[in-house]
UniProtKB/Swiss-Prot annotation:
Positions where Phosphoserine occurs in the chain: S7, S28, S62
Organism: Mus musculus
GO cellular component annotations of the record: cytoplasm; cytosol; endoplasmic reticulum; lipid droplet; nucleoplasm; nucleus; perinuclear region of cytoplasm; protein-containing complex
Name of this chain's protein: Protein SET
Family: Belongs to the nucleosome assembly protein (NAP) family.
Name of the gene this protein is made from: Set
Subcellular locations according to the entry: Cytoplasm, Cytosol; Endoplasmic reticulum; Nucleus, Nucleoplasm
Bias type Basic and acidic residues, positions: 35-45, 168-180
PTM annotation: Some glutamate residues are glycylated by TTLL8. This modification occurs exclusively on glutamate residues and results in a glycine chain on the gamma-carboxyl group. N-terminus of isoform 1 is methylated by METTL11A/NTM1. Mainly trimethylated.
C-alpha cells in the first residue's frame, strides 16, 4: 500500500522576534567595565547577528519549498482527476472510507451514514499559492435530505495569519435537518442518561468557531485525500470479531474433546486396575485350597 503523502512545510505567518537583549552601552563606555561583562555583551551582539542570518535562510527555504510544492501540486491534478473517475465506479466508496477512518467515524451518527450513501465524489483543492488555504467539495446525488448537489467548506489564512472559514448553506428538505435532529436526540439522551450519539457530521459545515483548529478539515485534507483507498480497504471490524469468536469456539470445542479423551483414558485405567485386583484375589483363594 502506498505511503501517505506528507505535506511540505509551508511558510508560516511571521512571528515577531523577541526583543534583542539590551546593550550595555553606558557600561561599555566606562573604562572601568569588567572584562567578563564586556565579553558577554559582545557575544550577545554576535549571536543576534548569526540569528538574523538563520532567519533569512529559513525564509528563503520556505519560499523555495513553496515553489516546489506548487509545481508538484499542479502535476498531481491529472492523477487526482483520473482517480476520481475510477472511484465513481465503486458504489459507496466515500461513505465506506469515512466509516473506516477512526477519527471521522467517531463523528458519524446512523442518519449521517445514510445521508453519506449519496456522496459520490470528494475533492480537495489547495489555493494556487497553497499557503493561503484550501477548499473541500462534497458532491451528492439526489437525496431525501437536502437540495444541494455540492457542499463546500473553505479555509483561509489572511496576510496577518488569522484563520477563517466559510461554507455552503445546506438547504435541508422539510423535517430532514440532521443538525437539529442530532441536538434533540442528545437532549433526550441526557435526560434519560442514555448513550449520546455524536453531533451530526453536517454541523461541521456551520461551525466556524475555530477555523485554525478544524481537525476534520485537516484529517480529510492531509490523511484521507492523499490516499483514500487505504481506508476503503480496511477490513470490516465486525467480520474480524466474528471470525475471532468462531476461532475461540473451535478452540473451546477442541479443548473439550481433549478433556473427554483424557477422562476416558483415566476410566479405562481404573477398570484395568480393578480387573488386576480381581485376578490376584482368585489366585490367593486357589493357593489356600
Amino acid at each position: 500500500m502506498a505511503p501517505k503523502r506528507q505535506s511540505a512545510i509551508l511558510p508560516q505567518p511571521k512571528k515577531p522576534r523577541p526583543a534583542a537583549a539590551p546593550k550595555l552601552e553606558d557600561k561599555s563606555a566606562s573604562p572601568g567595565l569588567p572584562k567578563g561583562e564586556k565579553e558577554q555583551q559582545e557575544a550577545i551582539e554576535h549571536i543576534d547577528e548569526v540569528q538574523n542570518e538563520i532567519d533569512r535562510l529559513n525564509e528563503q527555504a520556505s519560499e523555495e519549498i513553496l515553489k516546489v510544492e506548487q509545481k508538484y501540486n499542479k502535476l498531481r491534478q491529472p492523477f487526482f482527476q483520473k482517480r476520481s473517475e475510477l472511484i465513481a465506479k465503486i458504489p459507496n466508496f466515500w461513505v465506506t472510507t469515512f466509516v473506516n477512518h477512526p477519527q471521522v467515524s467517531a463523528l458519524l451518527g446512523e442518519e449521517d451514514e445514510e445521508a453519506l450513501h449519496y456522496l459520490t465524489r470528494v475533492e480537495v483543492t489547495e489555493f494556487e499559492d497553497i499557503k493561503s488555504g484550501y477548499r473541500i467539495d462534497f458532491y451528492f446525488d439526489e437525496n431525501p435530505y437536502f437540495e444541494n448537489k455540492v457542499l463546500s467548506k473553505e479555509f483561509h489564512l489572511n496576510e496577518s495569519g488569522d484563520p477563517s472559514s466559510k461554507s455552503t448553506e445546506i438547504k435541508w428538505k422539510s423535517g430532514k435537518d440532521l443538525t437539529k435532529r442530532s441536538s434533540q436526540t442528545q437532549n433526550k439522551a441526557s435526560r434519560k442518561r442514555q448513550h449520546e450519539e455524536p453531533e451530526s457530521f453536517f454541523t461541521w459545515f456551520t461551525d466556524h468557531s475555530d477555523a485554525g483548529a478544524d481537525e476534520l478539515g485537516e484529517v480529510i485534507k492531509d490523511d484521507i485525500w492523499p490516499n483514500p483507498l487505504q481506508y476503503y480497504l480496511v477490513p470490516d471490524m465486525d467480520d474480524e470479531e466474528g471470525e475471532a469468536e468462531d476461532d475461540d469456539d473451535d478452540d473451546e470445542e477442541e479443548e473439550g474433546l481433549e478433556d473427554i479423551d483424557e477422562e476416558g483414558d483415566e476410566d479405562e485405567g481404573e477398570e484395568d486396575d480393578d480387573e488386576d485386583e480381581g485376578e490376584e484375589g482368585e489366585e490367593d483363594e486357589g493357593e489356600d485350597d
